[in-house]
């Protein structure tokens, strides 16, 4: 995707979600999360009006609130990444904006296995969004992604179940549309917490990735970075 000619100096995208009840009640079906974005062309001094993209990136079943929110998937809690989205900088998917996310589906389940991580993306500067597949691990939750080399994407997710105290890593070779693999990286120990991942450079044909989290299986302590 080329740069948007209408904004030669670029735009900042701010993705966010709103809700009419707390997460616990939304998870039980007693509330709604909606998904939005705003943009700025002056480095965040002034922002556009919010654009509601709930119908494109979320699957709520709340027709009593909005008759169009009547998806059989019955997603309930929904959250964008606690950190940054990303825009692909190189190769086939250059320009694509990808936002990590997670949602719960249906009634609450034991050990938070109604939650799962996924994402959504746009190839036309926010006109149309598409939902990525869910990652293959129930209980995956807060997530953040970074661009790897050779058209690949890595997403790093929290394990809300808490049974394995390590980060969940998912790899995509098609820009985040689907996932080649999802697994627990037991070298990245974690106390059930969010971690941060960021592409910080490029050297010898490969992207350089920075990672930071609380590297402790019992408490949010022992800051680790690599």
Report the location of each language-model feature:
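Asp-box/BNR beta-propeller blade signature and adjacent active/binding-site loops
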Residues: 1-226
């Amino acid at each position: 995707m080329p740069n948007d000619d209408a904004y030669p100096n670029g735009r900042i995208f701010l993705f966010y979600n709103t809700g009419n009840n707390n997460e616990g009640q939304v998870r039980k079906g007693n509330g709604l999360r909606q998904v939005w974005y705003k943009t700025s062309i002056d480095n965040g001094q002034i922002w556009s009006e919010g654009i509601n993209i709930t119908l494109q990136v979320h699957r709520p079943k709340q027709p009593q609130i909005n008759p169009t929110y009547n998806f059989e998937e019955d997603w309930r809690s929904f959250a964008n990444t606690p950190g940054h989205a990303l825009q692909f900088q190189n190769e086939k998917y250059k320009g694509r904006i990808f936002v990590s996310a997670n949602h719960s589906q249906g009634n609450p389940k034991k050990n938070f296995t109604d939650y799962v991580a996924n994402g959504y993306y746009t190839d036309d500067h926010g006109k149309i969004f598409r939902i990525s597949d869910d990652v293959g691990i129930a209980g995956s939750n807060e997530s953040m992604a970074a661009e790897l080399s050779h058209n690949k994407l890595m997403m790093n997710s929290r394990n809300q179940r808490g049974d394995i105290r390590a980060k969940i890593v998912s790899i995509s070779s098609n820009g985040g549309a689907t996932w080649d693999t999802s697994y627990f990286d037991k070298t990245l120990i974690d106390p059930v917490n969010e971690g941060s991942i960021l592409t910080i450079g490029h050297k010898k044909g490969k992207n350089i990735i920075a990672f930071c989290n609380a590297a402790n299986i019992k408490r949010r302590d022992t800051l680790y970075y690599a």
